[in-house]
Amino acid sequence: MSSKSSSHTAYLDQPKPGRLNIQYAPDETTQIVENPPRFTWLPVVENEARYVLRISTDKTFSDKATQTYSNIPLNFFTPDTTFKKGVYYWSYSIWNETDKASISQWSQIRKFTIVDNLPSTPLIGRTARYDKCATSHPRLWLSPELITQFKSELKSNPDHCSWAAFFEKSVKPWLERPVMDEPAPYPNNVRVAPIWRQTYIDCQELIYAIRHLAIAGHILEDDDMLAKAKAWLLSAAEWDPDGPTSRAYTDEWAFRVAVAIAWGYDWLHGQLTEDERTLVRKSLMARTKQVADHVIKHANIHLFPYDSHAVRSVSAVLIPACITMWDEEEQAREWLDYSIELMLTV
């Protein structure tokens, strides 16, 4: 990849990071524990800026000794290849994809050392990342092939993976339970602890009802259980994404509703008509977007990586929700890329 500079080289701001900011890394004080190392830096102010990263065994970055990664959309990066033992230097710049060139000064040069026998943990680039991913459903926990295997093992051992306890405690309670109504807002929209706690529990149980009935229905080939799970799912999909279970109203409720709908969309995909899939996916997209927008645009966890709710929602909500629909919704794939790169790099 070219790392040539534009004729109009802009100033590159490199502010000193605070204790709670993402750091410039690696440097010569960093103990590298995996190969390749993870590269992080403070983002520039410009929205949607892209970067070019150069890594070299030569401090002058001669072409022969330098690897260059361009058009990086985030201020953190994991290369798709490992490095040989040795001393390396790296720096970054702002990238213009139209001109295929660096358009700013290069950053301060930092140094790191790769030693022998480090765990090999490269990250496949975005272009090829999903090439070998199955597009069948379900995707969360078990694939169709693993479901077949699970059924076979359950026939030879009725308590395989503690199935009896799972069915008794996590499936049976939902067989007769009526479908949950949409939670009501707080009285006068003033948060009250007992209502917060009870609705939190109710939304957690929404996950249990949809997920556990759907799993048991598939494993036991029980149409009644699948129909019950579907009824819960379609009801939740009709709830107002901007209502009491929106992220802005009460994030802990919103997280659980989004996760419940994600499991339902995935495990009941074959039980839904095309119109029902559209309904459920529209709801899931709206709820996932609320979380993604908060994480990426408002909490800015790629700059402030210690916001507990925002960071937790990446693995708890964004990843499972986006896994279920990455091949159907372009934005979901973008959010999944962000989540994968954040979790693996930062």
Model-identified regions with their sequence ranges:
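Residue-level recognition of well-ordered beta-strand positions that form the cores
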Residues: 40-42, 54, 93
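Conserved aromatic anchor
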Residues: 36-46
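Aromatic-lined, polymer-binding surfaces characteristic
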Residues: 183, 196-346
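Short, compositionally biased P/S/T/A/G/V-rich stretches that sit at domain boundaries
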Residues: 1-38
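Extracellular fibronectin type III
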Residues: 3-8, 97-117
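Low-complexity, Ser/Thr/Pro/Gly-enriched N-terminal "stalk/linker" regions
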Residues: 117-191
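Recognizes extended acidic, P/S/T-rich segments that occur
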Residues: 50-87, 97
